Amino acid sequence: MFEGEFCAGWYWVIYSDANGKFHRALVGDKGEIILSAGAIGSPQLLLLSGVGSESYLSSLNIPVIHSQPNVGEFMADNPRNNINLVIQFPFSPSPAQVVRIMTSTEVSIATIAEKTTGPLSHGSLRLSSPKEAKATPLVRFNYFSDPADLSRCVKGVRKLGDMMNTNSMDRFKYTGFNGERGFMFLGPALPSNWSDDSSVEDYCRSTVTTFWHYHGGCLVGKVVDGDFRVMGINSLRVVDGSTFIILPGTNPQATLMMLGRYMGLKMLRERRESQ
């Protein structure tokens, strides 16, 4: 992301277009670089550009532009555990969930999920290539590494079990099937003994999957300041989910759109006031 003389007040941004042709954009002393590549892309680009842990970058032979040990740290995601039930009658999904229309209606699948919102567990992002921005980075979220997250998952799975025991769920049981409580599961079934913490904890760990609510890597107060400027670097901001230490309980899209509009108006106001 940086090229040439870094401290001279001018920055070059190298990018490629859809045809693979490289271009160089020159940012003047009153301009800014706004990085909004998301919780995965923004810390990756900073590391590739030489902004990160000095020891880590040096181990990859990446020239250190600015030592910032928290880039790529505190990566988190809202973990999800779900059950999939095979049911014997056509089941109409929400239109928002339809990916394609199948020609066969022999089997219907119902999915019920529980989510651990605002996890305390976090991990890190590392580069898989020290030169290629298109190379997928290595990310570990360390789901349930904090005992509090695992405890919340156990409570959520038990809530799923309580719901499965209600009369309203009887219609989803598979006639003549002697499986777990009369239900046919696609994939792992709920633990047979919900009162056993160890069994439910094992279930949480073995069935966890992502909700694609990635955040962290460029946290406010650790990598960027309250105005989302990268601390120690002039004219560079990160404005996306990588700055969040916690996400809202639902899909973060609206929150991120709000952040973009808020920061856009704020930067325009700052520029008018500086003229």
Task: Name each region found by the language model.
Residues 246-265:
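A conserved FAD-binding loop/helix module that cradles the flavin
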Residues 232-248:
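Short FAD-binding loop at a beta-strand-to-alpha-helix junction that anchors the flavin cofactor
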Residues 114-126, 215-237:
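FAD-binding beta-loop-beta segment adjacent to the flavin cofactor pocket
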Residues 43-118, 129, 146-198, 202-214, ...:
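Mid-to-C-terminal "cap/lid" subdomains and adjacent gly/pro-rich loops that border
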Residues 19-32, 36:
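Core beta-strand elements of the Rossmann-like FAD/NAD(P) dinucleotide-binding domain
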Residues 17, 37-38, 49:
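Glycine-rich, N-terminal phosphate-binding loop of Rossmann-like dinucleotide-binding domains
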Residues 19-21, 144-151, 249-254:
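Conserved, non-catalytic sequence blocks in retroelement Pol enzymes and Pol-derived host proteins
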Residues 1-19, 73:
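A conserved short coil-to-beta-strand element within the FAD-binding core of flavoproteins
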